[in-house]
Amino acid sequence: MATPSLDSARAADAAIEKAPDLLPEALPGRRPSLVGLTRDALKAQLIGMGVPERESRMRAGQVWHWVNFRGASDFAEMTNVGKALKAQLAEHFTLERPEVASRQVSRDGTRKWLLRMAPTNRQEHNRGAEIECVYIPGPDRGTLCVSSQVGCTLTCSFCHTGTQRLVRNLSAAEIVQQLVTARDELGDWPGQMPSRDAGGSGEVGRLVTNIVFMGMGEPLYNLDAVVDAVGVMSDQEGLGLSRRRITVSTSGVVPQIPRLGEQANAMLAISLHAVRDDLRDELVPLNRKYPIAELLAACRAYPGLSNARRITFEYVMLKGVNDSDADARELVRLLKGIPAKINLIPFNPWPGSRYECSDWDRIERFSEIVFNAGYASPVRTPRGRDILAACGQLKSETEKLRARARLMQEEGIGVESFYAGADD
């Protein structure tokens, strides 16, 4: 396999260093949404609106219940809130969710939503940034894969999202709104009729039982928002998910790993994908900054690590690249002493990717070596491949359209009609 050029390596390193603190700001004159706010932020908004501070905790608790437990989409639904206060709330705020710009359902039942966030500046032609969110139904759980950034800086060579430039971080509210929108789409609120064929099963009848931060972006480059979002999602008087059912996946931003454990108390997943630094430098350029030894040292010190709170190591199976018996044995050696599970991920192809998925018998042999060494080594069943919703395939539809338009321009093909029909 070709080694990346010096220029591309430098570009990747520059992208890693960037990690910009880009957060959305509401357009002037636009009423903010209360959906997804933390308790403290909600209380502050009500006080700012004029609710007396001595009443603010009670009023915030009422609104919290309707927004995060009942899934209210209109202030009129809040039956235990006085008429005057409801009118005041409606004057100052909304209960808007992101716009669902498109819906796709895979043959296997996986659902992918393209979500358009509220516009944050006029340079975006009044179209908010777009992210993808995926729901994966299973026999004993329903997993929602959420995004933490619009695009990504990391340029991992096997990942489609890495080909989309970073636009900005998502706010904590925008991360939570992905769960709220999924529950809207699935009919997953108390008293609602679940969407037909939504699949899933689990505690208190919820369709969405698990959250994985494995969508667009590197969560630990937006850790403040991720910590707040986990807090809102796991509040037992609201959205009610267990923190043990919330997993945050990182490519290895080593300095932030302890804080994730201390403040979010979420389960940790590591996108490892290689057992040698030279190969991981190519697959996951962040490795040049935080090599494997440093990453695994941080894993061994992860707060709360135990056999009951294992770290998941994700390992994408690339034909002829990282799938040999020797790779499997070295993986076992590296992880010695870390309570861990190794998820083997068949590579999911995407347009323009230069890798192939390992043959199935090679994946099974790799799994057998790891399993015989005492580690659970499930092979992740590819879900949603036909709608580009599988691991490593996410990239917002608008970005795909722009890329296609650039190609058309380079080839001398007019793009005016192309963009005109993009929203049809």
Swiss-Prot record:
Keywords assigned: 4Fe-4S, Cytoplasm, Disulfide bond, Iron, Iron-sulfur, Metal-binding, Methyltransferase, rRNA processing, S-adenosyl-L-methionine, Transferase, tRNA processing
Catalytic center residues: E132, C391
GO molecular function: 4 iron, 4 sulfur cluster binding; metal ion binding; rRNA (adenine(2503)-C2-)-methyltransferase activity; rRNA binding; tRNA (adenine(37)-C2)-methyltransferase activity; tRNA binding
Binding-site list for S-adenosyl-L-methionine: G217, E218, S249, S271, L272, H273, N348
Subcellular location(s) per record: Cytoplasm
Needed cofactors: [4Fe-4S] cluster
Binding positions ([4Fe-4S] cluster): C152, C156, C159
Catalysed reaction equations from the record: adenosine(2503) in 23S rRNA + 2 reduced [2Fe-2S]-[ferredoxin] + 2 S-adenosyl-L-methionine = 2-methyladenosine(2503) in 23S rRNA + 5'-deoxyadenosine + L-methionine + 2 oxidized [2Fe-2S]-[ferredoxin] + S-adenosyl-L-homocysteine; adenosine(37) in tRNA + 2 reduced [2Fe-2S]-[ferredoxin] + 2 S-adenosyl-L-methionine = 2-methyladenosine(37) in tRNA + 5'-deoxyadenosine + L-methionine + 2 oxidized [2Fe-2S]-[ferredoxin] + S-adenosyl-L-homocysteine
Positions of the Radical SAM core domain: 138-388
GO biological process, any: rRNA base methylation
GO cellular component terms listed in the entry, alphabetical order: cytoplasm
Disulfide-linked positions: C145-C391
Entry's EC annotation: 2.1.1.192
Cofactor binding annotation: Binds 1 [4Fe-4S] cluster. The cluster is coordinated with 3 cysteines and an exchangeable S-adenosyl-L-methionine.
Further information: Reaction proceeds by a ping-pong mechanism involving intermediate methylation of a conserved cysteine residue.
Role: Specifically methylates position 2 of adenine 2503 in 23S rRNA and position 2 of adenine 37 in tRNAs. m2A2503 modification seems to play a crucial role in the proofreading step occurring at the peptidyl transferase center and thus would serve to optimize ribosomal fidelity.
NCBIfam families: rRNA_mod_RlmN
Alphabetized HAMAP family for the sequence: RNA_methyltr_RlmN
Family note: Belongs to the radical SAM superfamily. RlmN family.
Protein name (database record): Dual-specificity RNA methyltransferase RlmN
Source organism of the structure: Methylobacterium radiotolerans (strain ATCC 27329 / DSM 1819 / JCM 2831 / NBRC 15690 / NCIMB 10815 / 0-1)
